[in-house]
From Swiss-Prot:
PANTHER family: THYMIDYLATE SYNTHASE (PTHR11548:SF9), THYMIDYLATE SYNTHASE 1 (PTHR11548). This is Thymidylate synthase. Its EC number is 2.1.1.45. It holds the Pfam family Thymidylat_synt. It comes from Mycoplasma mobile (strain ATCC 43663 / 163K / NCTC 11711) (Mesomycoplasma mobile). GO terms for biological process: dTMP biosynthetic process; dTTP biosynthetic process; methylation.
Amino acid sequence: MEQYLSLLKEILEKGQKKEDRTNTGTISYFGTQRRYDLSKGFPLVTTKKVHLKSIIFELLWFIKGDTNIKYLVDNGVNIWNEWPYETFKKSKDFNGESLADFVLKIKSDTLFAKKYGELGPVYGKQWRNFNGTDQLFDAIETIKKNPDSRRIIVSAWAANEISKMALPPCHAFFQFYVNNNKLSLQLYQRSGDTFLGVPFNIASYSILLAMVAQITNYEVGEFIHTIGDTHIYLNHLEQVEEQLSRKPLKLPKLVLNKKIKNIDDFKYEDIEIIDYESHPAIKAKVAV
């Protein structure tokens, strides 16, 4: 994953200090792009251990059109917990519960989860019901019937619903492209937390690309990752330096269940990353 390491270096070399919504502070560089050829291996960062389970379940959650964290926490995925917890803390029902207490209540109390586990009309809702349009289904059908179309786009950015979202979409929209019997996907991401979030985004959309390629009978091409505000949080600088000191290892392989022919039929056990070797995990705090 030299491309990813070069992205970290580019931000450090060209970026400027910038304040942000979380009051953490960043080094930010505007407008970056990296290309990942999936025929050369699955683009999963090897210079630190990445939590694959979270990536896969989150992607399945998007595809389901779900916007409540209960599905995630029930499956041991905790990457979205902080946002609804912050909303809960401002409610009249908050009695000093810790984040861990909040998550336990989401798991055990369906009514509580329905009320306080909701993130609003975020990714999954927009992918599958953008003002009544199932964008993901339409994109797949267009790939099958009109692969040369320049309109094979799925957008998570619904301007009229941004205020209702716990967090406006960072990975805002993506486009499919067919050429030489290969399917490629380009993602535009308005904001990229390059240490914590971007490795997830690269892997997630690469899996999605492989899924759609399989069900539309194309080979996998490239994942092209374009990011607007590409940043490293100031409290991640030590972790970034540690990661840059490590040598990348051989890329793993993605294996999908070949029997799956419909995007909605994929389950966790149908998606496997094999031969993944990595350096140890590097912990860092998410900015909320």
